[in-house]
């Protein structure tokens, strides 16, 4: 499942890397020098760094600061281990022509693992919130019945239209983060448009985790409504 080498010799490093490259995710912590040649040229002097080699050919070199790597190569990169002294990792791609050479001066540890891809789901998008409302219509109010989603208007798409228990059309605008003034203005445009089509029996409701003070003031002034949505209350 995983392997670890501590303070390995050059022979151990070479054997370990050549046996696992392109098969497992490899992480190396080492003092190294990094040379880059391609659209520009750069040299990073000897320093402790974290080197990641992925089975798809991705190469990433991290220092102790910042999110972005010092150097990297994308999937499809050709990775070679050169049994020189110091031992060298060469990561090369042809379009565009770019080469990273990593001279491993002192390796403190190497790990490798068989990392598998799992399912990835994003929750909290506006489309997910609309889905939640459709599955749990009572979160709007008892008796609410969803009718249509993504309803086209000249001003954009209404997230959801439904009916309340009194037969009023309900226009719902969803925001996944704190609603601003523009969210109220958008909802009001939809509200006016639907009044022209359906008459006076229209309600406009904003669904969001929260809204700004000015947005709340405008919402109340225009006769619209607000329902607070907390994703934690509806997460499986």
Curated annotation (Swiss-Prot):
The record's annotation in InterPro entries points to: Endonuclease_NucS, NucS_C, NucS_N, NucS_N_sf, tRNA_endonuc-like_dom_sf
- Per UniProt, what is one GO molecular function of this protein? single-stranded DNA endodeoxyribonuclease activity
GO cellular component labels: cytoplasm
* Compartment annotation: Cytoplasm
EC number(s) given by UniProt: 3.1.-.-
Q: Which UniProt keywords apply?
A: Cytoplasm, DNA-binding, Endonuclease, Hydrolase, Nuclease
- Predominant place of localization: cytoplasm
Q: Which HAMAP family match?
A: NucS
Function, as annotated: Cleaves both 3' and 5' ssDNA extremities of branched DNA structures.
Entry-linked NCBIfam families: PRK04247.1
Instruction: Tell me its family.
Output: Belongs to the NucS endonuclease family.
Task: Please give the name of this protein.
Answer: Endonuclease NucS
Question: Which species?
Answer: Saccharolobus solfataricus (strain ATCC 35092 / DSM 1617 / JCM 11322 / P2)
What is the phylogenetic placement of the source species in the record?
A: Archaea, Thermoproteota, Thermoprotei, Sulfolobales, Sulfolobaceae
Name of the coding gene: nucS
């Amino acid at each position: 499942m995983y392997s670890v080498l501590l303070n390995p010799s050059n022979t151990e490093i070479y054997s370990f890397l050549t046996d696992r490259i392109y098969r497992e995710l490899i992480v190396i912590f080492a003092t190294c020098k990094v040379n880059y040649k391609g659209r520009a040229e750069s040299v990073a002097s000897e320093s402790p760094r974290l080197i990641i080699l992925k089975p798809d050919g991705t190469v990433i070199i991290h220092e102790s600061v910042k999110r972005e790597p010092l150097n990297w190569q994308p999937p499809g990169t050709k990775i070679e281990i050169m049994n020189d002294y110091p031992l060298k990792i060469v990561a090369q791609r042809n379009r565009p022509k770019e080469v990273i050479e990593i001279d491993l001066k002192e390796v403190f540890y190497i790990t490798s693992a068989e990392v598998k891809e799992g399912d990835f789901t994003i929750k909290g998008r506006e489309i997910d919130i609309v889905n939640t409302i459709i599955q749990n219509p009572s979160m709007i109010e008892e008796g609410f019945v969803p009718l249509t989603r993504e309803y086209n208007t000249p001003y954009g798409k209404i997230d959801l239209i439904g009916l309340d228990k009194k037969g009023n059309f309900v226009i719902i605008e969803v925001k996944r983060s704190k609603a601003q003034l523009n969210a109220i203005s958008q909802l009001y445009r939809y509200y006016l448009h639907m009044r022209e089509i359906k008459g006076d029996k229209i309600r406009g409701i904003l669904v969001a985790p929260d809204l700004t003070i000015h947005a709340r003031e405008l919402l109340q002034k225009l006769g619209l409504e607000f329902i607070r949505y907390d994703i934690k209350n509806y997460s499986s």
